[in-house]
Amino acid sequence: MKKIMFIVMMGLSPIGFSGPVVEIYECQINKGKTLEDLSDMMNTFSAYLKKAGLSNSYKAHAGFQQIPIKPGSVNWIGISPTAEDYGKAIEWFTSSKDGQAFGELYQSVYTCQESFMTFITTSSK
């Protein structure tokens, strides 16, 4: 019985101790848009998060791809400290007027092709 409990606990430990949630979108800046438009969009996003009380639940970073170099690339990197915080951010994005307005804004600035999400389970020290 102890062996079974140990196996179950080991199997559940990554779930209980998983760290931040990271999502990455590989995007291209839309024709006629500039990095200044991207910066303005990020400022708007920060204001929306603050208004919604989500500043500590989700942080976004945007940058261009270095290797290999892709002209016009924009990578969106979103980080939430926990899965619960990520859920709060997604709920805001999909069900609030500000979230939907931001969706329209970002789609006017860039278009995304690929994305992935990961849970950080361990990190270097």
Which residues are covered by each model-predicted region?
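Short S/T/G/P-rich N-terminal loop/turn motif that feeds into the first structured element of a domain
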Residues: V8-M10, P14-S96, S108-K125
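Non-heme di-metal
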Residues: F102-G103
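Positively charged n-region of N-terminal signal peptides that target proteins for export
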Residues: M1-I4
